[in-house]
C-alpha cells in the first residue's frame, strides 16, 4: 500500500433508491467535494433472498438431494446477479453525483453486500466499514424500504444502537 493511500480518511456511504439515501449522497458531496484525502466506499445492501430461494424440502434419494441443492444454488446466484444489475444504476448515480461535487472517481469505490437478512443489515454495514477500514459511516434515515417493511424498524437506528468506536452521519 502506498503512503498516500494509507493516509486517506475512509468513509462508508450506504446507498439505495430512497430520498434519504439521495440526501446522504448530497451531504457527503457538499462536505467532502473538492477536498483531498478521502476515500468513499459506496455500499448497496442487496435485499434478502425470497423465501422460496432459501431452502427446499429435501429428498430421500441422496442424488436427487444433491441435484435439488445445485438447482437451488444456481437459482440463488441468478437472483443475486439480477439484484446486482438492478442496483447498478443507483451506484452509478451516486458516483456521478459525488464526481459532480468534485470528488475524484479514483477515490470512489462501489460495492454490494450479499443478500442481507433484515435483522443483520446493521451488522453487515458495520462489518463492511471495519473490513474497508472506514472510520465513518454515512446512512440516510428511513432508507432501505425492504428493511422497514419486514422489521418495522430503521437500519440507521439499528446501526446507531450497535456502533462502537466509529463516527456516524445519519442524514434526514
Give the role of each language-model region.
Residues 55, 75-99:
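Redox- and metal-dependent alpha/beta enzyme cores, enriched for Fe-S-associated oxidoreductases
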Residues 6-8, 119-120, 136-161:
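Glycine-rich, Arg-bearing micro-motifs that act as flexible, cationic patches
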Residues 10-12, 39-41, 109, 136, ...:
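A structural signal for isolated positions on well-ordered beta-strands in alpha/beta enzyme cores
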Residues 2-75, 103:
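Small/aliphatic-rich secondary-structure junction motif
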Residues 69-82, 108-110:
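Short glycine/proline- and acidic residue-enriched helix-loop micro-motifs
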Residues 157-172:
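Short, flexible loop segments at boundaries between secondary-structure elements
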Residues 26, 126, 157-158:
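Active-site phosphate/pyrophosphate- and oxyanion-stabilizing loops and adjacent acidic/basic residues
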Residues 6, 85, 93-136:
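Structural beta-alpha unit
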Amino acid at each position: 500500500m502506498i503512503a498516500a493511500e494509507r493516509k486517506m480518511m475512509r468513509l462508508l456511504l450506504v446507498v439505495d433508491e430512497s430520498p434519504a439515501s439521495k440526501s446522504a449522497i448530497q451531504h457527503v458531496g457538499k462536505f467532502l467535494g473538492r477536498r483531498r484525502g478521502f476515500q468513499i466506499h459506496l455500499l448497496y445492501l442487496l435485499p434478502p433472498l425470497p423465501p422460496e430461494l432459501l431452502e427446499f424440502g429435501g429428498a430421500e434419494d441422496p442424488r436427487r438431494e444433491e441435484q435439488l441443492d445445485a438447482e437451488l444454488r444456481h437459482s440463488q446466484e441468478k437472483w443475486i446477479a439480477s439484484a446486482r444489475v438492478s442496483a447498478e444504476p443507483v451506484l452509478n448515480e451516486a458516483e456521478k453525483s459525488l464526481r459532480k461535487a468534485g470528488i475524484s472517481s479514483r477515490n470512489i469505490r462501489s460495492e454490494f453486500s450479499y443478500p442481507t437478512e433484515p435483522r443483520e443489515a446493521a451488522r453487515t454495514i458495520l462489518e463492511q466499514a471495519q473490513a474497508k477500514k472506514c472510520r465513518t459511516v454515512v446512512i440516510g434515515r428511513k432508507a432501505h424500504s425492504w428493511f422497514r417493511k419486514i422489521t418495522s424498524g430503521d437500519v440507521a437506528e439499528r446501526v446507531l444502537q450497535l456502533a462502537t468506536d466509529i463516527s456516524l452521519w445519519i442524514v434526514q
